[in-house]
Amino acid sequence: MATKIFVLLALLALSVSTTTAVIIPQCSLAPNAIISQFLPPLTPVGFEHPALQAYRLQQALANSILQQPFAQLQQQSSAHLTVQTIAAQQQQQQFLPALSQLALANPVAYLQQQLLASNPLALVNNAAYQQQQLQQVLPMISQVAMANPAAYLQQQQLAYNPLVAANAAAYLRQQQLQQILPALSQLALVNPAAYLHTQLLPFNQLAVTNTAAYLQQQQLLRVNPVVAANPLCAAFLQPRQLLPFNQISLMNPAFSWQQPIVGSAIV
């Protein structure tokens, strides 16, 4: 009998413990849910685990950054672009005097510099830009070299000649003289009289003032065999050849023959 009473008490105690274990958590969560609706959101956070608190703070910070107004970001980017534009204008104003002087001194170099600034490849990689320009010029250079090797070599020497940059007229005169000198040397070997004649030609006033009279005079001098044999006699025999065209010789031949002798005696 006593054992039955003891078993009933034990069963009653177990039933009470199970009911409290199930009911108490349900009753304990209800006040927290109700209180969290009326209290600030930071109040229940204080009862949470520290790791969970840090995670929720990180999420709140990320949401605040993502929810930043787009207009503010756009305003910052426009301000940055404005600063860059002002800096570029200041640099351009600094370089404008130098560019204007370059345009007056060498227009070709100025245009090349303008094209260089507008080429994105030149801004990124100057070596690649120079190689590209060289590839564009190489076909034309190869064609010139195959068609006329002498002109190609002259063009290469022209690029590295300081006389061309300093004085183009003196360079052209020098080139003409170098081209004429071989012909003059051959003429001096073959016909010394003609060579002396070409040397005296720049100093002849008649050839400069009246070319027709000078040519007529030369044709008359060629008829005389003495002049062909000895060009130095041309100065003395030249008036004799022009006697038919001299009015003094027609009026007084004796005085015409005497006049050069008197002149030479005076000299």
From Swiss-Prot:
<comment type="similarity">
    <text>Belongs to the zein family.</text>
</comment>
<keyword id="KW-0732">Signal</keyword>
<dbReference type="InterPro" id="IPR002530">
    <property type="entry name" value="Zein"/>
</dbReference>
<keyword id="KW-0708">Seed storage protein</keyword>
<dbReference type="GO" id="GO:0045735">
    <property type="term" value="F:nutrient reservoir activity"/>
</dbReference>
<feature type="signal peptide">
    <location>
        <begin position="1"/>
        <end position="21"/>
    </location>
</feature>
<keyword id="KW-0758">Storage protein</keyword>
<protein>
    <recommendedName>
        <fullName>Kafirin PSKR2</fullName>
    </recommendedName>
</protein>
<comment type="function">
    <text>Major seed storage prolamin.</text>
</comment>
<dbReference type="InterPro" id="IPR051529">
    <property type="entry name" value="Seed_Storage_Prolamin"/>
</dbReference>
<dbReference type="Pfam" id="PF01559">
    <property type="entry name" value="Zein"/>
</dbReference>
